[in-house]
Swiss-Prot record:
GO terms for molecular function: DNA-directed RNA polymerase activity; metal ion binding. It comes from the Archaea. GO terms for cellular component: DNA-directed RNA polymerase complex; primosome complex. The lineage of its organism: Archaea, Thermoproteota, Thermoprotei, Sulfolobales, Sulfolobaceae. Keywords: DNA replication, DNA-directed RNA polymerase, Magnesium, Manganese, Metal-binding, Nucleotidyltransferase, Primosome, Transcription, Transferase, Zinc. This is DNA primase small subunit PriS. HAMAP family: DNA_primase_sml_arc. The keyword Oxidoreductase does not apply. It is an enzyme of class 2 (transferase). The keyword Magnesium applies. Its EC number is 2.7.7.-. Catalytic subunit of DNA primase, an RNA polymerase that catalyzes the synthesis of short RNA molecules used as primers for DNA polymerase during DNA replication. The small subunit contains the primase catalytic core and has DNA synthesis activity on its own. Binding to the large subunit stabilizes and modulates the activity, increasing the rate of DNA synthesis while decreasing the length of the DNA fragments, and conferring RNA synthesis capability. The DNA polymerase activity may enable DNA primase to also catalyze primer extension after primer synthesis. May also play a role in DNA repair.
Amino acid sequence: MGTFTLHQGQSNLIKSFFRNYYLNAELGLPNDMELREFALQPFGSDMYIRHLSFSSSEELRDYLVNRNLPLHLFYSSARYQLPSARDMEEKAWMGSDLLFDIDADHICKLRSIRFCPVCGNAITSEKCERDNVETLEYVEMTSECIKRGLEEARNLVEILEDDFGLKPKVYFSGNRGFHVQVDCYGDCALLDSDERKEIAEYVMGVGVPSYPGGSESAPGWVGRKNRGINGVTIDGQVTIDVKRLIRIPNSLHGKSGLIVKEVTNLDDFEFNEALSPFTGYTIFLPYISIETEVLSRNIKLNRGVPIKIESSIGIYLHLKNLGEVKAYVR
């Protein structure tokens, strides 16, 4: 089977955008970064590079810019005595933060299209027989779906603050949802998988009874149930995992080119071009003809017809498989 290699961040131009970003990016690193495992997926590979350890932001930056430019960049929720050890037992787990993952595509039904990047035809299989290449998939992420994910994050924050007395931070994942993180120390950090599962099930509303006739303003689940909140839609496996990798705040998501960004005020969050660090314009060559919503804008593309468009949009379209960024225009 032929392999089509110019999509998903493989072009040198996209790499240059990412490298220039990481030259000056102020990554959101934990104060105890020397206790964390770092990992990344480099450009041009499906494999992750793991078991990395850094003691300063400068050391990390030098590695990213000069040795392994990341398409995706992570650190561990766990703290380890030896984070660079390749054997998980040798790392010596010291506790971990508490994580929650909200994927908007688990909440909404999104439009999905699979197509051949050569002929542009819609194809349901993973291969185009005519051109002997692998097909690509595009999933449209809408602002309405992101809003629904944000509402789930809002409900989760309320539960963690009011019912557990925790101080969660909310991050836009950089692509299709939100991460909610509690920096844990002491007993919180030492919660095992079973205890974290209980917390996950609690916020999902598993086993929580109905309270008919209760007041909407009542505290806890009584008020939530009577406001129509039956639970928060999270990926429970993320919460249970005590050795999970976290996307580094202010890193770039390799499937969108958007920043993994802390949301300090949920009321002010907007799914738009401001989430991209890229300025200027690009020349974008579409693989297919399509009208689609992109970062809260309606975009019309015609197959094979180059379009001059903001770099934030062009890079997003490229990483979403809809075509190629061919040039940068200042």
